[in-house]
């Protein structure tokens, strides 16, 4: 997450911006540390609010977030200090006194940006909400109280300072409330598109970056989060790499349709180029200064349009997790 994206290779916001799109990103950047060659302001993002620091991104009451607004005239990404947090220690009993909850702040900025979009100019938004990863923490509000009553006998977790996660009571209630909070965020995004009259011309995708984890006291077994799939985050079993992918495009994508097409996130660049009408994007965006440069992705636009016969497929799919020397290859009817 701290390692910068390679500046020699184009990323999706840069392509969208070059083709007339207003670009916004709200949440976790994970594409380079502060001051690196790959921060949102340098990679095609017009407006950003959220985490650039990977360390802070594991906490919901961080010391600071980052923001950038090209229209406002910002010259670079800057820090936004969480004044209601910094007077209290990051680990220990004082942490519970922090008040600036990052998830709500990020969502508020995302909605504000979305409400400023219109039919007159295309827009590309990436809302990388971090809920429910990885710290189990949120305001002690009615939502959390509801789940505390639901789980009468709940699990506690003692905390782990080296991993920066504080002790947690009611871990199941915390997790369930965080999922419900995320669900409410998604509902507000969809409702905003409907109210703005943008739903029929906006593709919305809801997905995740990996399977469930056990960090911070999370208990995926209790919630049966991956059903019958084996494995967790940081593993190459299906439980670690097979994730939800839900798409809505009113009037274009048929409702209540499922697909068993295997694909990967690198297929989204050509897919978004198809959606945006960007033609010949490999030739246009390959770095001609590099001896070897290419795009791995295959557009899944035909599948989104329920045109399975036109859908090209990968001869194989490959995953690896270097920290544990895991490799997986999938070919054919597996």
Question: Can you name each region flagged by the protein language model?
Answer:
Residues 18-24, 43-46, 119-125, 198-204, ...:
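Loop/turn elements at helix/coil->beta-strand transitions in domains of secreted/extracellular proteins
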Residues 31, 35, 54-269, 273-294, ...:
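Active-site-proximal cap/lid insertion segments
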Residues 48-49, 246:
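Short, well-ordered beta-strand core segments
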Residues 1-25, 34-35, 40-47, 57, ...:
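Active-site segment of extracytoplasmic enzymes that catalyze sulfate/phosphate-ester chemistry
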Residues 2-5, 233-238, 318-320, 326, ...:
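Short Gly/Pro-enriched turn/cap motifs at secondary-structure boundaries
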Residues 12, 28, 268, 300:
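Short active-site alpha-helical segment characteristic of glycosyltransferases
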Residues 13, 113, 325-331:
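Short, surface-exposed beta-strand/loop micro-motifs that present aromatic residues
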């Amino acid at each position: 997450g701290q390692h910068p994206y390679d500046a020699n290779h184009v990323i999706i916001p840069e392509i969208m911006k070059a083709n007339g799109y207003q670009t916004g990103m709200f949440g976790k950047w994970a594409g380079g540390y502060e001051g690196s060659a790959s921060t949102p302001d340098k990679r095609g993002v017009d407006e950003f609010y959220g985490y650039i620091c990977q360390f802070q991104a594991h906490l919901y009451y961080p010391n600071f977030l980052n923001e950038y607004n090209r229209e406002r005239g910002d010259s670079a990404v800057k820090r936004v200090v969480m004044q209601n947090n910094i007077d209290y220690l990051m680990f220990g009993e004082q942490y519970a006194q922090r008040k600036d909850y990052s998830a709500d702040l990020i969502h508020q900025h995302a909605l504000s940006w979305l409400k400023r979009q219109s039919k007159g100019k295309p827009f590309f938004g990436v809302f990388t909400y971090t809920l429910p990863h990885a710290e189990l923490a949120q305001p002690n509000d009615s939502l959390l109280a509801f789940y505390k009553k639901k789980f009468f006998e709940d699990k506690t977790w003692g905390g782990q300072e080296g991993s920066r996660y504080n002790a947690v009571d009611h871990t199941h209630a915390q997790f369930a409330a965080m999922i419900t909070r995320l669900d409410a965020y998604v509902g507000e995004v969809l409702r905003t598109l409907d109210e703005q009259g943008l739903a029929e011309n906006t593709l919305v995708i809801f997905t995740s970056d990996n399977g469930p984890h056990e960090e911070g006291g999370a208990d995926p077994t209790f919630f049966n989060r991956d059903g019958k799939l084996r494995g967790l985050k940081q593993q190459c079993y299906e439980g670690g790499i097979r994730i939800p992918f839900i798409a809505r495009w009113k009037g274009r994508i048929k409702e209540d349709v499922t697909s068993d097409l295997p694909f990967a996130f690198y297929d989204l660049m050509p897919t978004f180029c198809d959606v945006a009408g960007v033609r010949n994007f490999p030739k246009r965006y390959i770095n001609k200064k590099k001896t070897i440069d290419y795009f791995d992705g295959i557009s899944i636009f035909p599948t989104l349009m329920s045109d399975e016969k036109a859908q090209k497929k990968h001869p194989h799919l490959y995953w690896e997790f270097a920290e544990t020397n895991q490799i997986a290859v999938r070919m054919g009817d597996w």
